[in-house]
């Protein structure tokens, strides 16, 4: 998910990037600044709140449902959430969603007792089915898969090591964002308007594998996974091909926006997505996470019911290990500064009221 124009694994008792016994004596960071170890929830109720830093910088504040001003991560906990998801871009404009921004937000979340998912886009801006743009700093190597694999591995390791240095222990790591047609186009693109691209799958698997290996090297206990859009579709073919290329994944991440499919009701899309989640988990023997979900606040009561129905259904599927709302904290027509230059409107699936309180949509997580 990038924008909408106005229109996860049994309980893990150790943190995913754990320190060695006795390492406390080696840590010179003041204890009060180190997040406490966060237990990985059996079912993640989460939100991607990667826009928080920029929202706060523009003056936006947050409140609990009763109107009490509070830090956004405390607000999320008050809504029944136990996890957050944070994206990482390589060298973004203004630094938003860059490594440093991600680490700061992850540290705040961990200090609040929330488990953390890290979502690598491998781009300087949103990567999704419509665009998977090469990071500018990597362009000199964009025709050399081996060189790019090295850059991707180094970037992945650098971000995860920076998180570890702040005491943050990612529970889940996404290698790419909505990579149905690969990533790092055109090098690891899978098809174009002429059909399948020769060698595309092999290059994609090579680069995905570099990210997976880097994530496991730094965070051996983390759940590392690829991510596709459209949870309601039959996506088994895609994961079969990825496995055929020799790639590994510990889980599957999917996006689900039940009110955006033309010709289908939200209830139909929910039902199809839940069925597909069950079949994917059975086919590949891994858990499934809904890494993105969103509904439209313009029809708040109906949308709240749609989300609650989906989460209730997901909770009944043993292999479904979590649901994350995408950017629920957006309110009051706010949008990132860069959207203006792009001619984009505001994200239309925020789930907070005009004064910065969670709307009834967020009750679905309680």
Each predicted region: which residue ranges?
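Bacterial Sec-dependent N-terminal signal peptides
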Residues: 3-6, 14-36
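Boundary/entry segment of secreted carbohydrate-active catalytic domains
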Residues: 35-72
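Acidic-and-aromatic substrate-binding clefts and catalytic sites of carbohydrate-active enzymes
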Residues: 55-56, 60-67, 90-100, 180-183, ...
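Aromatic-rich peripheral "rim/lid" segments of glycoside hydrolase catalytic domains that contact
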Residues: 57-61, 282, 298-313, 317-366
């Amino acid at each position: 998910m990038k924008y909408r124009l106005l229109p996860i694994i049994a309980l893990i008792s150790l943190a995913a990037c754990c320190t060695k016994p006795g390492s406390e004596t080696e840590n010179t960071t003041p204890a009060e600044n180190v997040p406490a170890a966060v237990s990985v929830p059996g079912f993640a109720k989460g939100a991607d709140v990667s826009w928080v830093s920029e929202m706060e910088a523009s003056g936006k504040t947050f409140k609990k449902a009763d109107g009490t001003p509070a830090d956004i991560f405390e607000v999320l906990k008050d809504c029944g959430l136990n996890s957050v998801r944070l994206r990482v871009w390589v060298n973004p404009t203004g630094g938003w969603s860059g490594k440093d921004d991600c680490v700061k937000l992850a540290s705040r979340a961990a200090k609040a007792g929330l488990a953390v998912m890290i979502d690598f886009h491998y781009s300087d801006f949103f990567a999704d089915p419509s665009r998977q743009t090469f990071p500018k700093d990597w362009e000199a190597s964009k025709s050399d898969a081996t060189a790019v694999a090295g850059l991707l591995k180094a970037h992945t390791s650098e971000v995860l090591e920076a998180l570890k240095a702040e005491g943050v222990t990612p529970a889940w790591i996404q290698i790419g964002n909505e990579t149905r047609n690969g990533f790092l186009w055109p090098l690891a693109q899978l098809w174009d308007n002429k059909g399948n691209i020769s060698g595309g799958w092999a290059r994609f698997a090579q680069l995905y594998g570099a990210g997976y290996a880097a994530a496991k090297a730094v965070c051996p206990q983390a759940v590392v996974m690829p991510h596709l859009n459209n949870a309601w579709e039959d996506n088994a073919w895609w994961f079969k091909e990825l496995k055929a290329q020799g790639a590994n994944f510990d889980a599957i991440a999917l996006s689900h926006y039940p009110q955006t499919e033309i010709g289908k009701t939200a209830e139909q899309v929910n039902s199809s997505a839940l069925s597909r989640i069950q079949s994917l988990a059975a086919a590949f023997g891994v858990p499934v996470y809904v890494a993105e979900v969103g509904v439209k606040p313009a029809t708040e009561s109906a949308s709240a019911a749609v989300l609650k129905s989906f989460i209730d259904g997901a909770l009944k599927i043993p292999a479904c290990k979590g649901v994350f709302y995408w950017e629920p904290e957006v309110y009051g027509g706010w949008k990132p500064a860069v959207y203006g230059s792009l001619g984009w409107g505001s994200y239309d699936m925020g789930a907070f009221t005009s004064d910065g309180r969670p709307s009834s949509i967020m009750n679905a997580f309680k």
